[in-house]
Structures are given as C-alpha cells and as structure tokens.
Amino acid sequence: MNLDFSERYAARPLTESDADAILTLCAENEQFYRYHPPLATKESVLEDLSALPPGKSAADKHYLGFFDGETLVAVLDLILDYPQEGTAYLGFFMTQKAVQGRGIGSALIGELLNELRKADCKKARLAVDRGNPQSKAFWEKNGFALTGEEFLHGDSAYLPMERAL
C-alpha cells in the first residue's frame, strides 16, 4: 500500500523523535480529550506509536504524520486487516487545530479511503467516543455509519462506525 498518498501533504511514518510534535498537535485539541480523557502525555504518545491490538504485528500498523513543510498537520494510526482481513482500522485521526473546518481532514480521509480501495480493502472501521457529537458528525460526513455496537470503556463507551469501500 502506498502510504504517501496525499496530494497536498508529505506523509511519512512517525517515530519517537516526532513525539513532541504529536503532543503539541494533541494538546491543541482539548475538545477531543473532553470526551476521551486523559489528556495526551509524552508517555502516552510514545505508547501509541507502537500499540497494537491482539493478534496484530508491527507490519500491520502505520502511524503516519502528514506534513506541510516541517509542520505536522495531521496524525493517523492505521491498522490493516483488523479486526478481520480486508478491514482497515483507523485507531486515531487528528488534525492541527489551525486547519480544522477547512475540509482538510475530510480530504485526507478521502485520499486514504481511495488508497485503501486500491489495496483491496473492503471496509474501513473506527470508533468514536459516546457523547462526542463533533467526532460522530465528522465521520458521518465522510460516509461512516454507526454499527449499533457499543463497547464500554471506563465511564464512557466506544461506538464503532464503518464504511464500505
């Protein structure tokens, strides 16, 4: 799969040396963490870089950054063939606050979905935090729909969403 699929931004795998830039991007997005506590820390960012669901290997994970020059504009955590073969799981997607509301996040997701389709993925899946209307609206705008499932997580729950490719 071609990971540098964005026409507008340079995409590359993120590493530990990018942790401060990732943390800065996350810290700008206080609203997300209102529904998904706790706030990101450098330690949690470093953990996320390599976190894998059961049964998956590092070869299945792509933790990508999208850059405008040296500026990190968006972060995407993608797991291929999870939770089943042919499904791409978007574990995390966040854009820099300064670019929100301008269609940039939707454009990146559109480019990602086109690339996943070319790679023979059949569907994309993700989960939003229950009670987060902004996240739910963003993903619905991008063609995702709630599956009807709910997975409890602390005092809240994750609501899976899917989109056929």
Region annotations inferred by a language model:
Residues 1-2, 155-165:
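Terminal substrate-recognition subdomain of acyl/acetyltransferases
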Residues 96-98, 102, 130-131:
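Active-site acidic-Proline motif in GNAT/NAT acetyltransferases
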Residues 117-127:
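Conserved GNAT acetyl-CoA-binding A-motif
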Residues 140-149:
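Conserved acetyl-CoA-binding loop of GNAT-fold acetyltransferases
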Residues 126-136, 152-156:
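Conserved beta-strand-loop-alpha-helix junction that forms the acyl-donor binding cleft
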Residues 106:
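Residues forming the Rossmann-fold NAD(P)(H) cofactor-binding site
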Residues 4-9, 13-19, 24-98, 109-111, ...:
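Acetyl-CoA-dependent GNAT
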